[in-house]
Amino acid sequence: MTADDVPRLAAIQGQPGVAAAWGEPELEKLAGKAAGTDECTVFAVELEGEVVGLVQYHEEDDPMYRHAGIDIFLSEDVQGRGLGTETVRTMAEYLIRERGHHRLVIDPAAHNTAAIRAYEKAGFKPVGVMRQYERLPGGEWHDGLLMDLLADEL
């Protein structure tokens, strides 16, 4: 992800379906991600040379708890075509094979069946429901589904 990607990613994050999960775009926050000042390592997702989303990971480096978490959003016009599954699977392979993580986690909203299906296709398994896990932009709480993938399951 570069600073040049920020306007496109902000436009994608502002799409109603994406904003419902990620909140309205904050240019300063996206610019921080592009500059590498965010706690996550961030990549733009491209399809045929066009930026269509964002994928990021955050790491727990303590060797006793070696794991990473993944977050992703895609433009509404490319959802449902397998790109989310492919992107998450590619990131999982990188985090396990190159970064040495034992466990990966992802935590979609419990009602986001499309995302859950994509993550299951990438190899993630449901672990449990986290009640009132995250507050939506409108202020109401919603449950999250904790999913994980162990290195030997990849």
Report each predicted region and the residues it spans.
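A short beta-loop-alpha structural element at the N-terminal edge
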Residues: 1-11
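Acetyl-CoA-dependent GNAT
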Residues: 15, 19-79, 85, 94, ...
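Glycine-rich acetyl-CoA-binding "A-motif" of GNAT/NAT acetyltransferases
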Residues: 50-53, 114, 141
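Conserved catalytic-core motifs of GNAT/GCN5-like acyltransferases
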Residues: 59, 105-108, 125-142
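Conserved acetyl-CoA-binding loop-helix of GNAT-fold acetyltransferases
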Residues: 80-95, 116-121
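Conserved GNAT acetyl-CoA-binding A-motif
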Residues: 97-107
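Conserved active-site tyrosine of GNAT-family acetyltransferases
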Residues: 119, 124, 147
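Terminal substrate-recognition subdomain of acyl/acetyltransferases
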Residues: 139-154
